[in-house]
Amino acid sequence: MTKSELVAQLAARFPQLVLKDADFAVKTMLDAMSEALANGHRIEIRGFGSFGLNRRPSRVGRNPKSGEKVLVPEKYVPHFKPGKELRERVDRRAGEPLKAEEPDDDL
């Protein structure tokens, strides 16, 4: 699902929201989540999962073109850990064929 599909589904589910307002709501939520992670905070959405940061220590890498050793600096990368309810829901549906065309009404 893309961001535009999420906006369209939100607008369809809540008819009082025009597409522009649904787009603003999704962008605002994603901006708030991005800002929280950028500031080193953890995000927890009960039943869905949590977003956090994992530290990747510095290491010596190799330039694939020249074979030269290069120092790859330490960095933090976003990490998602699914919650129990989400894992169970996905597991129940794992045996069913994927339906990319139909939106999930349970969201």
UniProtKB/Swiss-Prot annotation:
Residues 82-107 are annotated as: Disordered. This protein is one of the two subunits of integration host factor, a specific DNA-binding protein that functions in genetic recombination as well as in transcriptional and translational control. It comes from Paraburkholderia phytofirmans (strain DSM 17436 / LMG 22146 / PsJN) (Burkholderia phytofirmans). Keywords: DNA recombination, DNA-binding, Transcription, Transcription regulation, Translation regulation. This is Integration host factor subunit beta. Heterodimer of an alpha and a beta chain. GO terms for biological process: DNA recombination; regulation of DNA-templated transcription; regulation of translation. Residues 82-101 have a biased composition (Basic and acidic residues). GO terms for cellular component: chromosome; cytosol. The keyword Transcription regulation applies. Gene3D superfamilies: IHF-like DNA-binding proteins. InterPro entries: Hist_DNA-bd, IHF-like_DNA-bd_dom_sf, IHF_beta. Pfam families: Bac_DNA_binding (PF00216). GO terms for molecular function: DNA binding; structural constituent of chromatin. Belongs to the bacterial histone-like protein family.
